[in-house]
């Protein structure tokens, strides 16, 4: 049986990337929360 996670940079960026996060209100909230927490990486 194959594993469920098959790594793909393109799919990763398209679903969890910075631009995708900025498109929705909820996504922007995620970015802001990570900024407030002091995360080094905000998105992927």
UniProtKB/Swiss-Prot annotation:
Molecular function via GO: structural constituent of ribosome
InterPro entries for this protein: Ribosomal_bL34, Ribosomal_bL34_CS
One GO cellular component term: ribonucleoprotein complex
Source domain of life: Bacteria
Keywords annotated in UniProt: Ribonucleoprotein, Ribosomal protein
One Pfam family hit: Ribosomal_L34
Alphabetical GO biological process terms: translation
PANTHER family (alphabetical): LARGE RIBOSOMAL SUBUNIT PROTEIN BL34M, MITOCHONDRIAL RIBOSOMAL PROTEIN 34 FAMILY MEMBER
Entry similarity comment: Belongs to the bacterial ribosomal protein bL34 family.
Name of this chain's protein: Large ribosomal subunit protein bL34
Species, as recorded: Variovorax paradoxus (strain S110)
Taxonomic path: Bacteria, Pseudomonadati, Pseudomonadota, Betaproteobacteria, Burkholderiales
Gene that encodes it: rpmH
